[in-house]
């Protein structure tokens, strides 16, 4: 029989500016991680994430804490685990102030969407998508709609295009019935297809001008694959 795995060393939690963007340096031999939160540096600690995989979202924050309160301040720590046991906890990071809520959709399924039309989950060709394993694929006319419990502040969309980019179109609404256009800034990150045939990565950032917009509609104008969406909402400016 192969020897048992060694219990992993404690991971190193990285500085945290936003509770929706928590990352750490992983431990050799770790199979998953436990994320904990506290309101005081020395606890008591509450488990907020179990069996978190640090390979599930390459090149992105590993964990988003969605169960927080505006103006709250929190401390975080992480534990590595495998079949042989768990490490001690990482270093503690905090306090981290909560300025707004954030919905993070990694495009694994439709569970966070209010409505969707003409889109399908895509998991193939990860090398072309720079190892992104979960994306939402659509063509002209396809759309995603999100409904938030408070006014939307910003919407950031990470997208891949196999051909020339066909810009996404953004609309916002207070009631889900009457819509108005939300302008978006576009930033391209393409530096060539390289030896792996990389697609063209583009990031869009939309900020609704209409106050109290709780719905946002993201429409495809051509073939594209959305890899991640971050929507901030609530809180004060």
Language model regions located:
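Beta-strand-rich modules
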Residues: 65-85
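Extracellular carbohydrate-recognition regions
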Residues: 94-122
